[in-house]
């Protein structure tokens, strides 16, 4: 059975709460209880240290459970300093290893701030302000293995996420739970929206799509497309991050990077088919991430044409895949998103899907 862990903002909030409790109560702290805005969690604390009368440091370590997450076991520090009130209860800062946006702001996003308001702000003594500086000693090095820089997070990791739970969506024993959810939806719906990742699910909400027709897929897009075909589903809209979905254009229907990649090669092939010059194709192949490739193509004026064609090919290959394994024809439409969940391309079938009542 796969083990659920927690996202990075949870450990940041836990370290901050532990440091502030130690500063106020002057007692050791082996764990802290956190309100995850819906449920409670006990988070182990590795160390707390009082640095002076007004300053303490809390240290914990990231544990994403069985999810494939590069932050596993990375240390998370929170430096907390109390001072005479300045009109705000909490001041959050980025220390070493926590990224900043291109505008220089700390990469601390909404859910992380909500956790801090719920779990740290109530502990701040009346008339005081707590400055919390998050430090990720390995963050700068780990960020080099992500696509953070491609969407504006520089010099470190981000406290990013919409939930405290880190679900192991790529673990093999979760496929059956996805299939069960699909079967449940198929009992009442003939058209389904396959949401690839949390970004796909959030985009479905923003686009006003029927939440009762959404199905999360993890990396098993091919298996679930076939299941949908066997269940007699009429059509499926694929909605997700382009770096995942373009793999389907190359016939890769398990999108885990541990199974196969080929993203840049597929995008480069799309550039060739669109008539891009050889230098543009070369820059795609040399791009560090799929996001970077997309940005390069946008700057060169090629992105719209290339990704629209890739979306068409994703749908076409998906229809062929379902027909091959079920001998049935199921319509498929595709919308490609960037890392922020914005639509960068859709095929004609997706445009028709959105136009229907």
Curated annotation (Swiss-Prot):
Catalytic activity: Co-precorrin-5B + S-adenosyl-L-methionine = Co-precorrin-6A + S-adenosyl-L-homocysteine
One MF annotation (Gene Ontology) recorded for this entry: cobalt-precorrin-5B C1-methyltransferase activity
Gene3D superfamilies, per the entry: CbiD-like
Pathway the protein takes part in: Cofactor biosynthesis; adenosylcobalamin biosynthesis; cob(II)yrinate a,c-diamide from sirohydrochlorin (anaerobic route): step 6/10
Classification lineage: Bacteria, Bacillati, Cyanobacteriota, Cyanophyceae, Gloeobacterales
GO biological process, one term: anaerobic cobalamin biosynthetic process
Entry EC number(s): 2.1.1.195
Protein name: Cobalt-precorrin-5B C(1)-methyltransferase
InterPro entries for this protein: CbiD, CbiD_sf
Highest taxon of the lineage: Bacteria
Species of origin: Gloeobacter violaceus (strain ATCC 29082 / PCC 7421)
Sorted UniProt keywords: Cobalamin biosynthesis, Methyltransferase, S-adenosyl-L-methionine, Transferase
Similarity remark: Belongs to the CbiD family.
């Amino acid at each position: 059975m796969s083990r659920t862990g927690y996202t990075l903002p949870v450990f940041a909030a836990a370290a901050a709460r532990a440091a502030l409790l130690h500063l106020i109560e002057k007692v050791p702290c082996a764990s802290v209880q956190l309100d995850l805005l819906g449920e409670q969690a006990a988070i182990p604390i590795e160390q707390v240290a009082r640095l002076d009368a007004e300053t303490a440091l809390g240290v914990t370590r990231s544990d994403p459970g069985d999810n494939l997450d590069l932050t596993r076991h990375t240390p998370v520090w929170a430096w907390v300093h109390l001072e005479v009130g300045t009109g705000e209860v909490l001041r959050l800062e980025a220390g070493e290893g926590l990224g900043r946006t291109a505008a220089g702001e700390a990469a601390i996003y909404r859910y992380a701030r909500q956790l801090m308001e719920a779990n740290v702000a109530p502990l701040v003594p009346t008339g005081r302000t707590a400055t919390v500086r998050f430090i990720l000693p390995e963050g700068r090095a780990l960020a080099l293995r992500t696509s953070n820089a491609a969407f504006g997070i520089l010099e470190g990791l981000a406290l990013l996420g919409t939930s405290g739970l880190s679900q192991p969506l790529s673990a093999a024993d979760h496929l059956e739970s996805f299939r069960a959810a699909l079967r449940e939806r198929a009992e009442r719906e003939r058209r389904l929206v396959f949401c690839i990742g949390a970004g796909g699910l959030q985009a479905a909400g923003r686009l006003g799509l029927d939440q009762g027709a959404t199905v999360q897929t993890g990396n098993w897009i091919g298996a679930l497309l076939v299941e949908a075909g066997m269940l007699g589903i009429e059509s499926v809209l694929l909605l997700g991050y382009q770096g995942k979905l373009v793999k389907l254009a190359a016939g890769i229907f398990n999108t885990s990077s541990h199974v196969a990649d080929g993203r840049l090669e597929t995008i480069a092939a799309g550039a060739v088919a669109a008539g891009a010059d050889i230098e543009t194709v070369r820059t795609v192949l040399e791009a560090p991430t799929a996001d970077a490739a997309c940005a390069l193509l946008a700057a060169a004026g090629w992105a719209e044409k290339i990704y629209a064609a890739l979306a068409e090919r994703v749908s076409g290959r998906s229809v062929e895949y379902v027909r091959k394994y079920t001998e049935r024809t199921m319509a498929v439409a595709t919308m490609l998103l960037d890392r922020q969940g914005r639509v960068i391309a859709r095929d004609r079938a997706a445009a028709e899907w959105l136009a229907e009542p």
